Amino acid sequence: MQPWQCLRRFALAWWERTAEGRARSPREEVGPRDPGGRGEPDPERSSPPMLSADDAEYPREYRTLGGGGSGGSGGRRFSNVGLVHTSERRHTVIAAQSLEALSGLQKADADRKRDAFMDHLKSKYPQHALALRGQQDRMREQQPNYWSFKTRSSRHTQGAQPGLADQAAKLSYASAESLETMSEAELPLGFSRMNRFRQSLPLSRSASQTKLRSPGVLFLQFGEETRRVHITHEVSSLDTLHALIAHMFPQKLTMGMLKSPNTAILIKDEARNVFYELEDVRDIQDRSIIKIYRKEPLYAAFPGSHLTNGDLRREMVYASRESSPTRRLNNLSPASHLASSSPPPGLPSGLPSGLPSGSPSRSRLSYAGGRPPSYAGSPVHHAAERLGGAPTSQGVSPSPSAILERRDVKPDEDLAGKAGGMVLVKGEGLYADPYGLLHEGRLSLAAAAGDPFAYPGAGGLYKRGSVRSLSTYSAAALQSDLEDSLYKAGAGGPLYGDGYGFRLPPSSPQKLADVSAPSGGPPPPHSPYSGPPSRGSPVRQSFRKDSGSSSVFAESPGGKARSTGASTAGAPPSELFPGPGERSLVGFGPPVPAKDTETRERMEAMEKQIASLTGLVQSALLRGSEPETPSEKIEGSNGAATPSAPVCGSGSRSSGATPVSGPPPPAVSSTPAGQPTAVSRLQMQMHLRGLQNSASDLRGQLQQLRKLQLQNQESVRALLKRTEAELSMRVSEAARRQEDPLQRQRTLVEEERLRYLNDEELITQQLNDLEKSVEKIQRDVAHNHRLVPGPELEEKALVLKQLGETLTELKAHFPGLQSKMRVVLRVEVEAVKFLKEEPQRLDGLLKRCRVVTDTLAQIRRQVDEGVWPPPNNLLNQSPKKVAAETDFSKGLDFEIPPPSPPLNLHELSGPAEGTPLTPKSGNPTKGLDAPSKRNMDKAVSVEAAERDWEEKRAALTQYSAKDINRLLEETQAELLKAIPDLDCASKTHPGPTPTPDHKPPKAPHGQKAAPRTEPSGRRGSDELTVPRYRTEKPSKSPPPPPPRRSFPSSHGLTTTRTGEVVVTSKKDSVFIKKAESEELEIQKPQVKLRRAVSEVVRPASTPPIMASAIKDEDDEERIIAELESGGGSVPPMKVVTPGASRLKAAQGPAGSPDKGKHGKQRTEYMRIQAQQQVRVGYQAPRPLEGCTPRLCYMPLS
């Protein structure tokens, strides 16, 4: 290739890049004009424009999002959502004229610079002056085509995406909200142009259009700073935007810096989360994020230059998709029309044939590593300075694989710095920004063909797209891609003469050919005139920054782990230095014969694919899995390893880099050095299949990890919900407890009591102090005879008076507190009583159940046997049963009433005389009146019990001090001890033993005679009234409540003519047991009976025992009626019930106040009866014909 061709291409590229920034407004003139010409401003928007400037934007129409626009054209990529504007273009004549003048000036300026550059080239290379002049003429002729090519073709193809515009606008607003907290600009709403020579701003603009299309708020980012700008009028051209940026960053940016090719203005596409180069100011809308990216002039000549003040963040270059959907159609157009065939024969390898002639497309194609699209392309800015000295670099051109690769893979950073093959040592990147070479993305390391530290022309720059994702490759697609489209090798031509003109530096120092090639042989591999390098060489491999910092000399443990996965194909040392007629292994040499081309192509394709897969697989799974060992490092000196240390089956990533293992190496043949290694297609397919299996396994593991993460999230979410529900329940319960009236009343009473106690404590303390002082004064007077001063005594008297007044107030306050506390404590008192009485009640119920069980078993046995015991057997069993039942009834509360019907009473003769008893049968018809009397007496007993309970309730609610104190003492005693001992009452009050002499011989009125027979005649006059109530009970008048319960056992005892006490019974001992159980049940504590009766009045209390109580009362009334019908000549005596007497003796003090007198009588009488019971004897007399057996109690001598 001739040097003048190189210079021509340099000149063309330089002129295009220089004129690109200047001529954006003029090129927009190419857009179609609206037929309407100018319109009238809206009357309601008549305020003058803030800025007067010309408008160079495209004519456009706003359409509704529903798609009501005019045709398919006019649809913006980002429209202001909700605007419906179909007005035509409104430009004034001044704006149009200014636009034409501006475009003319810029064209003239560009032509002048181009001519100056061409003259410089002619003077420096006079031998190529003619060719350069022809090139200059052709460039002038091609100028209109250039501008027509720069037209936004996508404006006519994307008119049917209003929904996307809506989504993008919403996303832009949402993401810009996160920048609200950043630093605001210290400036008014607008800015003014102070330089009168600036003629690039829009001159005239109608107020309606400027306000309608004003973006509102813009976020400008430069380096680490972010400024928010409020704009009331439209940014109508790039010059306006440049002026705004220069005004916002006055100390850092100027208009000249913004217009230089080293500065890029990027705008964020919220829909795809990617920054792309701003080419049309109509893309700016409300809350847009604009980033200014600038390179230092010192490094501007190198595409991968150093970044200092520009902070190129990850979202600028890590595009998840292409830059914008409206510009995908012209992605390939700048490069493909010039690179559609192989490079010209004379083109040097340092210049890519596919150099774009237009502005770089804003796609992943043009992303040269971490640089914005403006810098994709070859380093041509200072070509004149380089052409004379060092050979041209290999050039940087977009990777052809960027078209097919996935867009969700981050692009690699470009290792192109001061030296093309500069070695990266321990994470020291050439980019200053944190998202440079050592970010998470894969790193593409370029190696120099010659001296790695020479000028970039020696080794050149290699830029690659990101590694293709595993999911986008299949074995067949890879094979067809490699064999059909990428490799077009000829017998003597370059190996990769494809349309992209891709150039690669050598993959490793071992594969460098000797610089001094033999005479007659092809030029050295690094020569600018050598053929194009192998595209599949291992230098295209990449590795991730695996742990802390990756480096070339010492790779991280993640990189070491790759040695187990795959290896890049290498060559024995004999092949590293090819002879005159041979080609180096990786294509850095003269063309090779075509016989082994297919084999080498496959090997290199495998190297490329294995490197890509290794970087993904090992960084995902084996990060830091194996420790770093010194044996795995290969130190390089000046970027080159010793040729005598070949690594079979592994190709180094760059000069001095640690070799990255690939698939198992092919068998190295023992043939001479010139013979290549043969790899069969079967081995290739096996390797590809293994790679596919590995990729599928990795996908499965990734799916499992995702499922596990989702499960963990669900479990955490469920736990949070459960905890939240529990907390809310507890909070609501606490709030409900606070709202409870009883709880609130208790809290208030407790607070009042604490205040009362505090006051009382204070008074007590003051009184103690006063007493001590008075005692001291008294001691002083007594011992020292000291005269007490009068003021001191007056002071003590005053303190005493104050204490007395305070104490009086406290005492007056106590009754109210007492009443409140009684109301609150009533619930506790009732609860304590319940705790005391409930065990007794349950035991009584259980005993009754046992008695019923015994009775039923006895009846069943008699029915089954069909034999009824004779009466004398019953009489023989009676005394034992009576004695047993008497002992058993001491703790008995309830008994079952007798099932047998009432029988007539008969006398039994005393056992001392031995004479038979004279039966005195009563009138049978009187027994028939018993049911009616029993019903009346039942009603009377219920009424009496109700009155008793009401009196007790009234006494409880009146809260007399005596009752409350007694109740509280009772409660305290009941809490301290368990159920009181019921046997203690009969032992504590012994009485005189009754004798028969005390009994009168006759008792004409049976029940009245019993009290007079009490020994010692104590309280005889008082006890006369008690049996009187008993005799009046059958009458209609209701008696007072206590007497019937006070003497329940006043019937059934008679005396014979000799004065002996005889107990008459209607049946066997079961009846006596029944009577005793009746008396015991009636003699239960008063609270129980009251509670049982009060159930009729107050249903909220303990469940009643009314059935058994009423049944027992019915039996009792029946007995009384039969006693009266038996005749008045039989003087009865009480049936002694020691258990009942003990209960009454124990319960006597706890009786109600209105029955105190009768309670004392009852207690005294029961004590006497208890003494009688000790001396009672039993006898079974002879039965008489036609009479039921009787039981006789005889007094002991």
Swiss-Prot record:
Residues 321-331, 391-400 have a biased composition (Polar residues). Residues 681-731 are annotated as: Interaction with SNAP25. The modification Phosphotyrosine is found at Y276, Y431. Its main location: cytoplasm. GO terms for molecular function: protein domain specific binding; protein kinase binding. Residues 65-75 have a biased composition (Gly residues). GO terms for biological process: behavioral response to cocaine; exocytosis; negative regulation of cell adhesion; negative regulation of protein secretion; negative regulation of protein tyrosine kinase activity; positive regulation of dendritic spine morphogenesis; positive regulation of protein tyrosine kinase activity; postsynaptic actin cytoskeleton organization. Expressed exclusively in brain. Abundant in telencephalon and expressed moderately in cerebellum, hypothalamus, thalamus, superior and inferior colliculi, and olfactory bulb. No expression detected in medulla oblongata, spinal cord or pituitary gland. Enriched in the neuropil rather than soma in the thalamus, corpus striatum and cerebral cortex. Detected in astrocytes. The modification Omega-N-methylarginine is found at R364, R371, R535. The modification Phosphoserine is found at residues 47, 52, 79, 87, 98, 178, 200, 204, 214, 260, 333, 342, 359, 378, 397, 399, 527, 530, 534, 537, 547, 549, 551, 556, 631, 655, 878, 900, 1021, 1077, 1094. Tyrosine-phosphorylated in response to EGF and to cell adhesion to integrin ligands. Interacts with BCAR1/p130Cas through its C-terminal domain and with CSK, CTTN and SRC. Also interacts with MAPRE3/EB3, SORBS3/vinexin and the N-terminal coiled-coil region of SNAP25. This is SRC kinase signaling inhibitor 1. It comes from Rattus norvegicus.
